[in-house]
From Swiss-Prot:
A Pfam family per the record: Anophelin
Annotated localization: Secreted
Name listed for the protein in its UniProt record: Salivary thrombin inhibitor anophelin
Top-level taxon of the source organism: Eukaryota
Entry GO CC: extracellular region
Function of the molecule: Salivary protein with anticoagulant activity that inhibits host thrombin (F2).
Keyword annotations from UniProtKB, A to Z: Secreted, Signal
Comp. bias intervals (Polar residues): 59-69, 80-90
Alphabetical list of InterPro entries matching this protein: Thrombin_inhibitor_anophelin
Family classification: Belongs to the anophelin family.
Organism (species): Anopheles funestus
Biased composition (Low complexity): 91-102
């Protein structure tokens, strides 16, 4: 009985899949498409293609920006930070002795 229900459910699912994949127009009828050839083509970029490169000022690239230091690019910054933190934090031997006393 259970196998019959499984087979019927599978056949219903297959029928639904076939019906949904069928074209949505009758046989012999040609599908119609929107004729939008008269619309102008829009560029993908928002940049003005008529703008010249002379407006670009390369001296702006050398101006300093007030941003945080990147430790990944400045390993000496990491060394300085580690030496400063080492003075403030207790050593590992101190923390291990404290945990055994409790």
């Amino acid at each position: 009985m259970a196998t019959k229900l499984i087979v019927i459910a599978f056949l219903c699912a297959a029928l639904i899949a076939v019906v949904q994949s069928a074209p949505q127009y009758a046989q012999g009828e040609e599908p119609t498409y929107d004729e939008d050839d008269d619309e102008p083509i829009k560029p993908h970029s928002s940049a003005d293609p008529d703008a010249s490169y002379e407006e670009f000022d390369p001296s702006q690239l050398t101006e300093y920006a007030n941003t945080a230091q990147d430790p990944g690019r400045r390993p000496h910054f990491l060394e300085q930070a580690n030496s400063n933190n080492g003075d403030q934090l207790p050593s590992q031997s101190d923390s291990s002795s404290e945990s055994t006393e409790h």
